[in-house]
Amino acid sequence: MKIHEYQGKEILRKFGVAVPRGKPAFSVDEAVKVAEELGGPVWVVKAQIHAGGRGKGGGVKVAKTIEQVREYANQILGMQLVTHQTGPEGQKVNRLLIEEGADIKQELYVSLVVDRVSQKIVLMGSSEGGMDIEEVAEKHPELIHKVIVEPSTGLLDAQADDLAAKIGVPAASIPQARTILQGLYKAFWETDASLAEINPLNVSGDGKVTALDAKFNFDSNALFRHPEIVAYRDLDEEDPAEIEASKFDLAYISLDGNIGCLVNGAGLAMATMDTIKLFGGEPANFLDVGGGATTEKVTEAFKLMLKNPGLKAILVNIFGGIMRCDVIAEGVIAGSKAVNLNVPLVVRMKGTNEDLGKKMLADSGLPIISADSMEEAAQKVVAAAAGK
C-alpha cells in the first residue's frame, strides 16, 4: 500500500524527523487559505499522487505571492499528471500539499528497504539527492552507500553518523542527520513499511537538516496491525480492478499485455507469466485465485479480466493440490457462461481430480483449448492471442 507525501511527513513528524510546515488542500480556495496560515514569503505547491517525478511533470511549483499560489493550485488541481512512473495515461491530481519554502543548499538521498539478497534491512544514502536514485545506481553506483541494520539493535549512533558523513552532511549537522536517520528507521520498523524514503534530505545554508519529501510503501499483509495506516488509503490512486478483486480475496495486479492469466498460487502465477513471455506473449494481469477458489471467485476473476478492452485470450493454469481440478472446471464453465466469454480460453489442469475436471470441460460444449503442460498451454494461448 502506498500513501501520499503529506501523509508520509505526518508519520515522520511523529518519529521526530524535521519536515517543513505544510497542510493538504483539496481545492484552490483551501490552498490559498493554507498559504495564508503558513505565512510567506515563499510557498511550494505540490501535486499529491502515488508516483515520483512530479516536478519534471509540472506538478511542483514554487510560489512567491499568494496570487501565484492560487494560480498554481488552479493549474495543478485536476490535471492529468504524467511522470515516468505513471505511464502515458498519467494520474489525475485530486489534492495538493501547500508547504513553506526551504533554503536548499545540499540535496541528499536516504531510504530504508528490505534487501532480498542479504535478507536484511538496509539503509541507503547518497550525495545525489533530488533525482531518480535508479539513475544514480546505474550510472554512479559508487555514490550509493549502504548500512545493514539489525532489528535487535536498531540503527546505531555510529552507523548513522558514518553514513551521514559519507553522503556529505557537514560535521556540525551530523547530530541532526542522526536524529532523522534513526527516526526514519523507527518509522520504517514500527509501521511494517517495505520502503521509507526521503528524497531530498535537505541541508540548508545555516546547516539545518530537513526532509523535503517522504515516500512510504507498506506491507499489505501487515495492515491488519495498523488501522491508522489503512486510514491513509486513497482509493482514487488505485486500480479499480484491483480494488474490486480484493473484495473477493483475489490477488490481482493489472499489467500491460493482452493475455489474461488465472492461476492458483503466486509462484505458479509468476512462472506462468514468465512462460508466456518466453514464447513471445505479454500477460495482461497477475491473478492468483488461491487455494480456496469457489465458482463465485472464478466467475468474478473472469469478469475482472474481461474488463480489459485489450484482452485477446485467457490462460487458466491450475495445479490441483488443496484446490480440486473439478471445482476449478465448474468455476471455469460457470464463469465462461456468465460473462458470455468471447475470447479464446486455454486451460491446463494437473493434480487432484484432474481427469474429472478435464471431462467436465470437454462435456461443457464450450470452445475450450486444452493443454497438458505449461509450455504447451503458453504456446497455445500466445498463438490464440495472435489470432493464429
UniProtKB/Swiss-Prot annotation:
The note on cofactor binding and number reads: Binds 1 Mg(2+) ion per subunit.
Which GO cellular component does the record give, naming just one?
A: succinate-CoA ligase complex
Keywords in alphabetical order? ATP-binding, Ligase, Magnesium, Metal-binding, Nucleotide-binding, Tricarboxylic acid cycle
Q: Which residues bind Mg(2+)?
A: 199, 213
Describe the reaction catalysed, as an equation.
succinate + ATP + CoA = succinyl-CoA + ADP + phosphate; GTP + succinate + CoA = succinyl-CoA + GDP + phosphate
**Cysteines paired by S-S bonds:** none
Ligand binding (substrate)? 264, 321-323
Q: Where does ATP bind?
A: 46, 53-55, 99, 102, 107
**Which GO molecular function annotations are given, in alphabetical order?**
ATP binding; magnesium ion binding; succinate-CoA ligase (ADP-forming) activity; succinate-CoA ligase (GDP-forming) activity
Task: Name the GO terms of the biological process aspect.
Answer: succinyl-CoA metabolic process; tricarboxylic acid cycle
Known SUPFAM superfamilies for this protein?
Answer: Glutathione synthetase ATP-binding domain-like, Succinyl-CoA synthetase domains
Which parts of the sequence belong to the ATP-grasp domain?
9-244
Annotated metabolic or biological route of this protein: Carbohydrate metabolism; tricarboxylic acid cycle; succinate from succinyl-CoA (ligase route): step 1/1
- What EC designation does it have? 6.2.1.5
Q: Which cofactor does it need?
A: Mg(2+)
Entry similarity comment? Belongs to the succinate/malate CoA ligase beta subunit family.
Q: Tell me, how does this one assemble?
A: Heterotetramer of two alpha and two beta subunits.
What the protein does comes down to: Succinyl-CoA synthetase functions in the citric acid cycle (TCA), coupling the hydrolysis of succinyl-CoA to the synthesis of either ATP or GTP and thus represents the only step of substrate-level phosphorylation in the TCA. The beta subunit provides nucleotide specificity of the enzyme and binds the substrate succinate, while the binding sites for coenzyme A and phosphate are found in the alpha subunit.
Entries under NCBIfam families matching the protein: PRK00696.1, sucCoAbeta
Name recorded for this polypeptide: Succinate--CoA ligase [ADP-forming] subunit beta
